[in-house]
C-alpha cells in the first residue's frame, strides 16, 4: 500500500509518479536581514560556549571520558576554522524544513542557500520565515503561484509550501530547475504510517533529482 499514490482520484504506482503531468511550482526568494558573520557555539547549561570557554569545557569533557578523543578533536577543529561555517557557496534542500530536529536554525546563521520544502501551513511557514528573516541566509521556497518580491511575511505564510505526500512530481520538477549542486536532507517526520509514506516520497524525489 505504501508504493501507491492517489492523484485526481486515480491510483498510481510510486515508480510511475514522476511521469505524471505536474503543476509548475514558482520560487519565492527571501534574504535574511542580518549582516552578522557566521557564528558557531555549543549551548550548555544556559550559556553559549565559544572560544576559550568552549576549549576549556572540551578539555574537561575529554578528561572525564564524556566525549571520545576523536570527538574532542573534531570540536577543536571547528573552533580553529570559523571559515568552515560560511556556507554561502552551498545550497541545501530541507525536506521537512521546519522539523524540530532539523538544521534550519544553524543554516540560517551560516549564510546558506536554503531550499525549504514543507507543508502549506501557516504555523510551519511562520517558523521558517521568522527563522530565516532573523539570520544571514537566503531562502528559496515553493509556491503554487508567482508572488511579487515585496510580498509581506503575513501573506507568504499563507502562500508558500508543497506537500510531500501529494505533490511528488511537482516537487521533483521544481528541484531540477536549480542549477546549483544540491545537498539533500530528508528530515520530514510524520506519525504512524504517514511517516513510511513521506520517507518513500523523499527517497523517490532524491533519486530523481540525483540522476
Enumerate the predicted regions with their spans:
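A short, basic/flexible loop-to-alpha-helix module at the beginning of a structural domain
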Residues: 69-88
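Short, small-residue-biased leader/transition segments that mark boundaries at the very start
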Residues: 2-5
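Conserved acidic E/D residue at the C-terminus of a beta-strand in Rossmann-like folds
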Residues: 116-121
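Extended alpha-helical scaffolding regions
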Residues: 156-158, 163-211
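Extended charged low-complexity segments that act as oligomerization/scaffolding linkers
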Residues: 125-179
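Helix-enriched interaction subdomains in cytosolic or periplasmic regions
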Residues: 27-63
Amino acid at each position: 500500500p505504501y508504493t501507491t499514490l492517489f492523484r485526481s482520484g486515480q491510483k498510481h504506482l510510486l515508480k510511475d509518479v514522476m511521469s505524471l503531468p505536474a503543476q509548475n511550482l514558482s520560487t519565492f526568494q527571501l534574504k535574511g536581514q542580518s549582516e552578522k558573520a557566521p557564528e558557531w557555539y555549543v549551548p550548555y547549561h544556559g550559556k553559549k560556549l565559544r572560544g576559550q570557554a568552549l576549549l576549556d569545557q572540551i578539555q574537561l569533557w575529554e578528561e572525564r571520558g564524556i566525549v571520545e578523543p576523536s570527538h574532542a578533536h573534531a570540536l577543536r577543529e571547528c573552533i580553529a576554522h570559523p571559515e568552515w561555517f560560511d556556507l554561502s557557496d552551498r545550497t541545501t534542500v530541507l525536506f521537512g524544513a521546519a522539523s524540530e530536529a532539523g538544521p534550519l536554525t544553524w543554516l540560517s546563521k551560516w549564510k546558506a542557500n536554503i531550499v525549504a520544502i514543507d507543508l502549506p501551513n501557516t504555523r510551519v511557514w511562520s517558523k521558517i520565515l521568522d527563522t530565516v528573516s532573523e539570520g544571514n541566509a537566503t531562502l528559496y521556497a515553493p509556491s503554487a503561484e508567482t508572488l511579487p518580491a515585496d510580498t509581506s511575511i503575513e501573506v507568504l505564510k499563507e502562500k508558500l509550501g508543497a506537500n510531500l505526500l501529494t505533490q511528488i512530481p511537482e516537487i521533483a520538477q521544481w528541484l531540477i530547475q536549480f542549477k546549483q549542486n544540491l545537498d539533500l536532507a530528508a528530515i520530514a517526520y510524520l506519525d504512524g504510517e504517514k511517516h513510511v509514506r513521506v520517507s518513500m516520497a523523499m527517497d523517490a524525489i532524491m533519486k530523481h533529482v540525483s540522476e
